[in-house]
Amino acid sequence: MRELGPGPALIVFSLAAGLFLVIALAIGLGTPLAALDANAGTWLHVRATPLVTNAMAAVSFLGAPTTLTIVAVAGSLLLLYRRMQSEAATLSTVVLGGNFLNFCLKHLVQRGRPVFDDPIFSLPTYSFPSGHAMASTVFYGLLAIYALVNARQRYAAYVAVAAAVFMVALVSFSRVYLGLHYVSDVMGGIAEGIAWLAFCFAALHYIRRGESSTGADADS
């Protein structure tokens, strides 16, 4: 797979990382974002129905870090079987590394999850940034980037990008609907996922450039 150049990737990383920091600071400082979080969650909670709840639970499963990790590992093994070592390493490193980063950030921020008198679901783990939003952004974003770089027809690449955006938005909405995250949690998860993707592709460029230079020196 051909990688993006480091310039655009580093710009995207800077913007996404900056947005993540702004959201984290807004949460910590108790800005009006906290009121938006509470109002949005309450508005959805009182309008929840069994049918929509079941649908959102299914959507949430498709964006779960555990689900996407299993898919990524299986995909990496398939790529290795097809002798696509670079693609296998990229897929596994980006997805597993993103999950580890999210785990670290959750324990650094230690934000509690939304609280309702009659919760649909409840979890004892930390809330910010959303692991589902991050994992979906990383996994489906990686597939979209692969399509952009490798699709033979442009419309196919655009369809892949639109599908990735739709999945990330739907998974993020499901987490707020189910009462497991604030809006700012999923916003932070998406920003984290974009920043991590951009960082990985910038790093991949420099690693491959170093390997090319080493190979050229060995041949000279």
Model regions and ranges:
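Alpha-helical transmembrane segments of multipass membrane proteins
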Residues: 17-21, 98-102, 170-171, 196-201
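Membrane-interface loops
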Residues: 34-35, 81-154
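Membrane-embedded catalytic cores of phosphoryl/pyrophosphoryl-handling enzymes
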Residues: 118-220
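Alpha-helical transmembrane segments of integral membrane proteins
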Residues: 9-12, 86-94, 156-163, 188
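Hydrophobic, aromatic-rich transmembrane alpha-helices
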Residues: 69-80, 144
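N-terminal transmembrane-helix/juxtamembrane module of multi-pass inner/ER membrane proteins
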Residues: 1-67, 107-109, 113-121
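Short helix-capping/hinge motifs at transmembrane helix termini and TM-loop junctions
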Residues: 27-31, 64, 82-83, 109-110, ...
